[in-house]
Amino acid sequence: MARYTGPTTRVSRRFGQQILGSGKAFERRSYPPGQHGPKLRRKVSEYAVGLNEKQKLRYIYGLLERQFRRVFEIAKKERGVTGERFLQLLETRLDSVVYLLGLAKSRAAARQFVNHGHIRVNGHKVDIASYNVKAGDEIEVKNSPASRQLATRCLEENRIRNVPGWLSMNAETFKATVNRLPTRDEMEQGINEQLIVEFYSRF
């Protein structure tokens, strides 16, 4: 299945909450696409509920099913609560971190920013969006006019966005630090990760 590139508001309406940074259009029409107004929805099966939750999280991070499932399998093999570790692995992807730091308006834009070589981690170029940062990592925008002009514009546009406590950002030096790994309340809200764990346990 290809990565979704269509209208973001349609995705938000499908899941009943803002996904992929959509805004006012979703607020006007928060009911599912295809309906001409809000109406009661039929009771859905446990399988459908789990599938919906999985798809919602996959859209938020913009991953293909194969990539998404691979991250889940890694989380399942590690110590700790599988669902929480799964979210942690998604949230600490380099593209997600770049987005959270305000260096891109969306995770999709952050993925391009990383892929185009604008980011350094611990002094080394990292152009792999799926790279997982760890506590103590130093992240920096490449010291070039093109990279820093782009970063400056994004930081200005996203200045009202709060950087989560597990990260720190110095906009003047274009440097950030991973203070620690995120806790559950610092990660994606509106997601019931246990439903995703139960969904994948069926296979």
UniProtKB/Swiss-Prot annotation:
GO molecular-function term, one example from the UniProt record: rRNA binding
UniProt keyword rRNA-binding, yes or no: yes
Domain S4 RNA-binding, chain residue ranges per copy: 92-164
Keyword Ribonucleoprotein: yes
GO cellular component term of the entry, any: small ribosomal subunit
Disulfide-bond pairs as recorded: none
Coiled coil: none
Keyword tags: Ribonucleoprotein, Ribosomal protein, RNA-binding, rRNA-binding
InterPro entries, A to Z: Ribosomal_uS4, Ribosomal_uS4_bac-type, Ribosomal_uS4_N, S4_RNA-bd, S4_RNA-bd_sf
Highest taxon above the source species: Bacteria
Cross-referenced SUPFAM superfamilies: Alpha-L RNA-binding motif
Gene Ontology biological-process entries: ribosomal small subunit biogenesis; translation
Similarity comment: Belongs to the universal ribosomal protein uS4 family.
Subunit structure: Part of the 30S ribosomal subunit. Contacts protein S5. The interaction surface between S4 and S5 is involved in control of translational fidelity.
Function (record text): One of the primary rRNA binding proteins, it binds directly to 16S rRNA where it nucleates assembly of the body of the 30S subunit. With S5 and S12 plays an important role in translational accuracy.
Protein name from the UniProt record: Small ribosomal subunit protein uS4
Organism: Opitutus terrae (strain DSM 11246 / JCM 15787 / PB90-1)
